């Protein structure tokens, strides 16, 4: 009888955990679309889910990404450290997740602050390992791409990236025919980032062609997505026509909003 009650209790807890995890993830998707005020609620729900079932890997992945987003967007070191811990726990439970390994490696390079060489090398090795294990994984390549932009050229080989622009082009080719209501601007953003990479390499002619390709991607149909696309197009067009600021200097391009932007009016002041 006691065993039966325990089984029923654990089953109910697991069900509640998944419900809270989904509630948190739904809120987090709204955050990525631009409604940043929902971020505390998203994290709260996912933390509640973790307290009920700390081994539910899908929730850990989304919670870690939410902390990563908070740390990168609002420059919160505590959130970066929280993200690292959650990704580390997730990898203990499922070592096969190279997407989590790439995120964890990137976080270690950030946390090293350019001073802790041992931590940086550990992060670089994790990024390189994730890439070697799953070279076709888009998430791994995207994390590698954004990490490489924050590293000096001589350090990029340490994470397995000798050709940052080539890596971005690979992702761009994957996303050219990609359609998603969740990430409606993926192709636009990747072509713009390729353009920025070419600008950094000094190839202004090819950079302009990549920016033009981004602007030619068909417009979305949803009103919110149209509003988001308008913001992205304006930034890209300004850069293409001689603007001095890299696209990454703009908040919507500096973190995770760009591919998902559908509520630009709800972005919090910077």
Residue ranges with predicted function:
Residues 10-51, 57-65:
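N-terminal leader/linker segments that initiate helical-solenoid repeat arrays
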Residues 14, 18-21, 25, 179-200, ...:
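Sequence context surrounding c-type heme c attachment/ligation sites in exported
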Residues 22, 62, 69, 103, ...:
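"A position-specific structural signal for the A-helix of alpha-solenoid helical repeats
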Residues 24, 28-36, 64, 69-75, ...:
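Short coil/turn linking the two alpha-helices of tandem helical-hairpin repeats
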């Amino acid at each position: 009888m006691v065993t039966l009650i325990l089984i029923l209790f654990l089953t109910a807890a697991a069900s509640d955990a998944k419900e809270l995890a989904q509630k948190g993830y739904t809120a987090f998707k709204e955050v990525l679309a631009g409604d940043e005020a929902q971020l505390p609620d998203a994290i709260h729900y996912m933390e509640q889910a973790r307290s009920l079932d700390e081994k539910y890997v899908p929730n850990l992945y989304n919670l870690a990404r939410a902390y990563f987003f908070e740390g990168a967007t609002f420059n919160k070191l505590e959130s970066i450290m929280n993200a690292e811990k959650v990704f580390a726990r997730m990898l203990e439970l499922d070592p096969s997740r190279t997407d989590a390994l790439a995120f964890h490696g990137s976080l270690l390079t950030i946390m090293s602050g350019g001073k802790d060489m041992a931590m940086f090398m550990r992060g670089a090795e994790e990024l390189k390992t994730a890439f070697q294990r799953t070279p076709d994984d888009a998430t791994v390549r995207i994390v590698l791409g954004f990490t490489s932009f924050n590293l000096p050229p001589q350090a990029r080989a340490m994470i397995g990236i000798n050709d940052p622009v080539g890596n971005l082009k690979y992702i761009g080719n994957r996303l050219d025919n990609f359609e998603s209501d969740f990430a409606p601007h993926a192709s636009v953003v990747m072509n713009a980032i390729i353009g920025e990479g070419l600008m950094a390499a000094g190839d202004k002619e090819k950079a302009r062609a990549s920016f033009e390709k981004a602007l030619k991607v068909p417009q979305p149909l949803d009103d919110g997505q149209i509003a988001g696309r308008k913001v992205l197009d304006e930034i890209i067009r300004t850069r293409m026509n001689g603007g001095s600021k890299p696209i990454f200097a703009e908040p919507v391009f500096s973190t995770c909003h760009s591919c998902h932007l559908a509520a630009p009016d709800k972005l919090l002041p910077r």
